[in-house]
């Protein structure tokens, strides 16, 4: 199964990805990134960091399932992981939902909405970004949140929509949902 976690920056996608791997039989899809590493990020743990040229070589070798540009960098995913028979989990940008449904029609998507958008913005501010990038992310959070809140067609593209109140109850609800999805698979 391929499970995608979707939501605004700061909603907890990385946190929940770790919890899903910790609690269930899932492995993380390694997101390839051409952007510079942020403070605290490690190659192989926070994703795979490479140059655009290195990524281009993987594409020429036919090893990339999908790539897209966002936030001034290119993000890509390896075919071996995207088409694996194993349970795999990754973070997906909401604008790529239609592409992913074509690549893996059986993909399961969980859209995580923050109960309080200000908490998501605050978490984005704590990411050690340049002031310019921070402002770009805050604008993107607002734009993304407004779009998902008002666009019913967009919301309907996701299999599940859950709320994160950044508390234990929200965590339990999201993990229970993953368990239910897994139970349906078997």
Where are these regions (language model features)?
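Hydrophobic anchor at the beta1->P-loop junction of P-loop NTPases
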Residues: 5
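P-loop (Walker A) phosphate-binding loop of NTP-binding proteins
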Residues: 8
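Walker A/P-loop
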Residues: 13-14
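Post-Walker A helix-loop "phosphate-sensing" segment adjacent to the P-loop in P-loop NTPases
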Residues: 22-30
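ATP-dependent small-molecule kinase phosphotransfer cores
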Residues: 33-88, 94
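Conserved phosphate-donor/acceptor-positioning beta-strand/loop module used by diverse small-molecule
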Residues: 89-93, 102-125
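Small-molecule kinase domains that catalyze NTP-dependent phosphoryl transfer to phosphate-bearing small molecules
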Residues: 129-178
